[in-house]
Amino acid sequence: MNLFNRNFQIMDISVVIPLYNEDESLPELTAWIERVMAANHFTYEIIMVDDGSSDNSWALIETLSTQNKHIRAIKFRRNYGKSAALHCGFQNAQGDVVITMDADMQDSPDEIPALYQMIMSEDYDMISGWKKKRFDPKSKTIPTKLFNATARKFSGIHL
């Protein structure tokens, strides 16, 4: 595992982005997150966890992290899966609030201020958001529905 930009400091938000072969979306996603953070005066970091990508993702992340001091980069030698990437991101997060986002831009960075406000003002330990309308292929929506059904069964929380 490689780790770039590891300077410890407390900040408002850590955005953890697990990714696998997402080189096309990363520049736009990071620019979008930066705009939202600047507009809301948040102190933040973006932790990108490359889960063994075989495309140009890692080279692009290295470039982005040298251009932006808020980006921290972690690289797995092989694909361990999204759960492992999230876990690694959580372990390295320094923000008071940790927000996860998928690299495919299905999650909107514009929601970050509302999520942060909800956590801070309502004194919640955790919140979860979901899309009302998805534009994903069935190969993504079916596993999500199975996960949510399992989570409902074991937690009693309707997802």
Feature-to-residue mapping (PLM):
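Cell-envelope/extracellular polymer assembly enzymes that use nucleotide-activated donors
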Residues: D12-S14, E45
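Short beta-strand/loop segment that forms part of the nucleotide-sugar
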Residues: T30, E34, F42-S53, I74-K75
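Acceptor/aglycone-binding surface of glycosyltransferases and processive sugar-polymer synthases
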Residues: R72-R78, K82-N92, V97, P109-L159
